[in-house]
């Protein structure tokens, strides 16, 4: 039995300069480590990210409490455990925490251990992490699917210090035949967008996720700039590239009026009006995927949007579902959305993440594995995307080392898989 010999938690730094938790799990022959990200626009149903709240240190964002739980009760409970028993180990940590949202130890503490355990187990088995995750997920053994990337290119909302309300404007390189080709396309388009912005005298400052964060007079202007950068790169919108947006609509929703406040355009929309506003953008700019197009507090609005757009556009629930099987089941029962964004730290363990992916797939929902705005160099989500054949991944632009690390890992995985890997093909009625 490959026993866990030691567990060491430590405080490290994420891409925003804030502390986060890293855990190293030791077994005979070596160790493996994992670090966890954090979000800026955080859904109310997410598992708790434990912070120190000591304003004298890192403005209250330290994670020494979470680290102390890794090095204390979690360490004590897991030493001597079989490192390959992922579900048992995750269950022990969840039960020790004893809360519904992991508020005692913190999802950041539990997830860092959970991912490090998976990495150590894959090392013991002498298989790549994606293969070990595939085994845990009980995926079909014949082929694995390489994910199609959704590549953030312009940032707004809470991810940027600008006037755009929509949080992310993304490109999807549907014309690519491999992940390597998709990355090339994304890199070239991003480069040309910078040139276009610069030539127009528009700021090329970056947002939290590495996309450009210019001040613009409308969302349509942002989409026009992206369209221009696609064409300047020699690609064709709708044929080679389609677009996606993340509205992060919970941040725009005024619960007192039940309206969406689009400050950049000085407009207020009802749920229905916001749906048709997004639909008009989708038709004009080949937007095939809309994430959080309604607030997590507006389930009726989300149901209406799904009824109107769900048969032709990928409608993703992020804050709505928070990678939580109970919330996802509610959405399935009410026919709300048709896809789910998967963020490991929203739920706080690998086992629960895999359970949510499986439930979504069984219900016919699309699955998109996602990074967070405060990222680390950890590449686990690349392996999770492949190991579960999720189909899509959202991990930022081809820029900034914490984002590029995931793309480079996907390049390596594609090379290792060879003909056993199939690149995901996006199918959408808007594209036909």
UniProtKB/Swiss-Prot annotation:
Signal peptide location: none
One family name in Pfam for this protein: Enolase_C
Active site: residue positions: 209 (proton donor), 343 (proton acceptor)
E.C. no: 4.2.1.11
Entry binding sites for Mg(2+): 246, 291, 318
InterPro entries per the UniProt record, alphabetical: Enolase, Enolase-like_C_sf, Enolase-like_N, Enolase_C, Enolase_CS, Enolase_N
Cofactor note: Binds a second Mg(2+) ion via substrate during catalysis.
Cofactor (UniProt): Mg(2+)
One GO location term (cellular component): cell surface
Gene3D superfamilies for this protein: Enolase-like C-terminal domain (3.20.20.120), Enolase-like, N-terminal domain (3.30.390.10)
PROSITE patterns to which the protein is assigned, alphabetical: ENOLASE
Biological or metabolic pathway of the protein: Carbohydrate degradation; glycolysis; pyruvate from D-glyceraldehyde 3-phosphate: step 4/5
Enzyme class: lyase
Gene Ontology biological process: glycolytic process
Catalytic activity line of the entry: (2R)-2-phosphoglycerate = phosphoenolpyruvate + H2O
Cell location: Cytoplasm; Secreted; Cell surface
Keywords: Cytoplasm, Glycolysis, Lyase, Magnesium, Metal-binding, Secreted
Positions that bind (2R)-2-phosphoglycerate: 167, 343, 372-373, 394
Domain of life, source organism: Bacteria
GO molecular function: magnesium ion binding; phosphopyruvate hydratase activity
Oligomer status and interactors: Component of the RNA degradosome, a multiprotein complex involved in RNA processing and mRNA degradation.
Function field: Catalyzes the reversible conversion of 2-phosphoglycerate (2-PG) into phosphoenolpyruvate (PEP). It is essential for the degradation of carbohydrates via glycolysis.
Family: Belongs to the enolase family.
Protein name, UniProt field: Enolase
Annotated source species: Blochmanniella pennsylvanica (strain BPEN)
Name of encoding gene: eno
């Amino acid at each position: 039995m490959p026993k866990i010999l030691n567990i060491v938690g430590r405080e490290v730094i994420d891409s925003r300069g804030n502390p986060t938790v890293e855990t190293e799990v030791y077994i005979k022959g070596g160790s493996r480590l994992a670090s966890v990200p954090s979000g800026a626009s955080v859904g109310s149903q997410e598992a708790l990210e434990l912070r120190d709240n000591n304003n004298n240190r890192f403005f209250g964002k330290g994670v020494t409490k979470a680290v102390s739980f890794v090095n204390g009760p979690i360490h004590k409970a897991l030493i001597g455990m079989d490192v390959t028993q992922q579900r048992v180990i995750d269950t022990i940590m969840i039960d020790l925490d004893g809360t519904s949202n992991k508020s005692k130890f913190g999802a950041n503490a539990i997830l860092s251990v959970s991912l490090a355990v998976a990495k150590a187990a894959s090392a013991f088995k002498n298989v790549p992490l994606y293969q070990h995750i595939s085994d845990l997920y009980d995926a079909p053994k014949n082929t694995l699917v390489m994910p199609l990337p959704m590549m953030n290119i312009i940032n707004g909302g809470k991810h940027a210090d600008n006037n755009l309300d929509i949080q992310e404007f993304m490109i999807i390189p549907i014309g690519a035949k491999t992940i390597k080709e998709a990355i090339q396309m994304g890199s070239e388009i991003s480069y040309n967008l910078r040139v276009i912005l610069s030539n127009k005298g528009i700021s090329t400052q970056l947002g939290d996720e590495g996309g450009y964060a210019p001040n613009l007079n409308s969302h349509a202007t942002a989409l026009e700039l992206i369209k221009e950068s696609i064409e300047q790169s020699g690609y064709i919108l709708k044929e080679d590239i389609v677009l996606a947006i993340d509205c992060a609509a919970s941040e725009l929703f005024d619960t007192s009026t039940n309206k969406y406040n689009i400050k950049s355009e000085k407009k207020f929309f009802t749920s229905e009006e916001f749906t048709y506003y997004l639909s008009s953008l989708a038709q004009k700019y080949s937007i095939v995927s809309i994430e959080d197009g309604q607030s997590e507090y507006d389930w009726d609005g989300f149901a209406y949007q799904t009824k109107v757009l769900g048969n032709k556009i990928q409608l993703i629930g992020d804050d709505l579902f928070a990678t939580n099987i109970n919330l996802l089941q509610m959405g399935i029962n009410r026919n709300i959305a048709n896809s789910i964004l998967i963020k490991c730290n929203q739920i706080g363990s690998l086992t629960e993440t895999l359970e949510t992916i499986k439930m979504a797939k069984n219900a016919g929902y699309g699955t998109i594995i996602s990074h967070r705005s405060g990222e680390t160099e950890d590449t686990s989500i690349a392996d999770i995307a492949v190991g579960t054949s999720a189909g899509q991944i959202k991990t930022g632009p081809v820029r900034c080392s914490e984002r590029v690390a995931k793309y480079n890992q996907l390049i390596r995985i594609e090379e290792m898989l060879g003909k056993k890997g199939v690149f995901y093909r996006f199918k959408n009625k808007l594209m036909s």
